[in-house]
Structure formats: structure tokens, C-alpha cells
Amino acid sequence: MNENRTLMLNGMWNNNPALVQLLGLCPLLAVSSTVTNALGLGIATLLVLVGSNVTVSLVRDYVPKEVRIPVFVMIIASLVTCVQLLMNAYAYGLYLSLGIFIPLIVTNCIIIGRAEAFASKNDVLPAALDGFWMGLGMTSVLVVLGSLREIIGNGTLFDGADLLLGEWAKVLRIEVFHFDSAFLLALLPPGAFIGVGFLIAAKSVIDKQTAARQPKQQKQAIERARVTNV
């Protein structure tokens, strides 16, 4: 239970892949213009993370260290291809919207990083939990950033949700306020870069306030031992 809690805190907050490790910034900045795009890419990344961590953990004792990275990349590429085919079949509109960023999941440093740093050194269950919480942490940042950009840029929320969830999801669209024209800065990558900066700053402020409320532990003074004669 303690290990699961540690993995959860690391993935969601303490070692969040987007806000702390600053990994996967390319899709984070390019795709998070709407909640739908952000959620779609986040779910795809989460599935690949869990699948790659589990697979790498299973084969870690059979893969020579000299070729482990190419093997890990092949595993990740196979899983990304499966996710891409599923999205092409069941969420074609979203598949077209995300475009090249779906196959680019293969090169995402989060996935290869967790495979090398954690999954290749741990059993299946911890590896799966690590992949899940890291993927959920990345998805959370994508959705929050996508929400902010969509509201500021278009004044809407969950626009195009039917691309991910089907026709019924059209009712989820919310018009927060009306824009005569879109605020392009929020919808383009520079706006995403600014948004990520604000999210990182907000996390830093919260961490500092949390640390300030913690009781300070007084360190015992250590008396130096004289080792030379005067």
C-alpha cells in the first residue's frame, strides 16, 4: 500500500512527467488546444505507458543489456501501432485531429524513460502501477492545459467531444462565454508554452506553501571531534 501511494504521489505530483521532469513537451504544447484532443492523446499515452512497462518488466531478464534500448523501442512502437489502429477504427475524427502526434508517441521520452528507469528493474505489478500513475499525471496536465486554452481561446469547453466519445457527447459542449473571434495566442503553441509556465509556477507555489506548513525538524548539533593535538 505504501509503495502504491508513493508511485501515485510521484506520478501525479512530486515527479510529474510534464511539470517536474518536463518530458513530452512537444505533444503537450501542440495538441492541447482543446480538452478533446488533450484527453485523446492522454489516454493513448497512458495505455502505451502501462503496456510498455508491463511488457518490459516481463522480458527484462531475457534481454541483453547491450540491446535493451532498441528492444524497448520496438515494444513501444508495437503498442503505439495497436493504439493507432484502434483509434483509426473507433475514433476516426480524433485520429485525423491528432495526426502525426499519435505515432510520435514512440519517441516520447516519458515512455522510454520509465521503461529504462523503472520497469526494467521492477516486477510486473509495480511497473504497471508506475505506468498508470505516470500516464495519469501526464493526462491530467494535458486536460488542465487543454481546458484553459479552450476556454481562453474559444470560450468553450468539451468542443468536439463527439470525436472521442461518439455522437451522444455533443451535449457535453459548454459555451462559457461568447467570442466574436478566437483568441489565437491561447490556441497556438506559444500560448501553450505560457500556460505550461503558469502551471509549473502554480505547482512551485503550492509546494512551498505546503513545505512552510510542515513542522520544522530541529537538527541536533554535532560536536566536532578533535583529531589533532595543539
UniProtKB/Swiss-Prot annotation:
Biological process (GO), any one: electron transport chain
Top EC class for this record: translocase
Keyword Thylakoid: no
Entry-linked InterPro entries: NqrDE/RnfAE, RnfE
Membrane topology: Multi-pass membrane protein
GO cellular component, one term: plasma membrane
Signal peptide per UniProt: none
Pfam families: Rnf-Nqr
Compartments it resides in: Cell inner membrane
HAMAP family hit by this protein: RsxE_RnfE
Name this protein carries in UniProt: Ion-translocating oxidoreductase complex subunit E
Organism, as annotated: Vibrio cholerae serotype O1 (strain ATCC 39315 / El Tor Inaba N16961)
Lineage: Bacteria, Pseudomonadati, Pseudomonadota, Gammaproteobacteria, Vibrionales
Recorded name of the encoding gene: rnfE
